Amino acid sequence: MLLLAALLCGCGTDENSGEDVRAHYENISGFSAHVKILSETNDFTMAFELDYAYNKEDVDVFTITGPESVSGVSGSIAGDSEATLALQYDDLVLDDARPVRPGMTPADAVFGVVCALRDTPADESWRESADGTALTVLHYRSESGDETIEKLVWLREDNMQPVYAELFADGTRELSIRFKSYQENGG
């Protein structure tokens, strides 16, 4: 739906932005972010907040900060797009908690977005503006089993920092991610 709205509002395309973004994310060593994730599956909607640290050379780590019922659960993600996920709360560790649909759960959605930005050519890109901020929007589409997975990612045009992302399965939005803070560690 957002793609259709972008096309109807006459937003211009930017053919080079996808490759520029890939180069940028291939060269950063890491970042830290605070994100809000809205998970919408079937008739159930739940909001999560988490602190996420991406480390190109090691494992990514996150800690859920909300809602209170799961606050303090932490996790680590190691590898690439076929990563392993471990969850931990106090002394209890659940190793290899790999989701059935990698990149489509609140625990590994940020990781899935980073993998797309870093490793995958965007299927299309265009420019938008929100609240006076110029944004680059990237659209990724892939097949996973018998379903189509799509990711839309909005980045600030001036520094390529992620602002927002939406993840779809077979045309239905299942996750939205709002980056509330973001700080790169360097290249």
Model-derived features with residue positions:
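C-terminal low-complexity, charged extensions that often adopt amphipathic alpha-helices
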Residues: R98-V137, T148-I149
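N-terminal leader/targeting segments and the immediate start of mature chains
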Residues: A6-K56, S69, G186
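One face of beta-strands
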Residues: F31-I37, F44-Y54, D58-I64, V73, ...
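Sec-dependent signal peptide recognition
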Residues: M1-L4
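Glycine-centered tight beta-turn/hairpin loop motif at sheet-sheet or coil-to-beta transitions
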Residues: D43-T45, E57, E68-V70, Y89-L92, ...
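Short, exposed beta-strand/loop patches in secreted or surface proteins that constitute
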Residues: A23-H24, L50-N55, G75-S76, D123-D131, ...
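An acidic-aromatic
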Residues: Y54-G112
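Gly/Pro-enriched, hydrophobic low-complexity segments
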Residues: T63, E124-G187
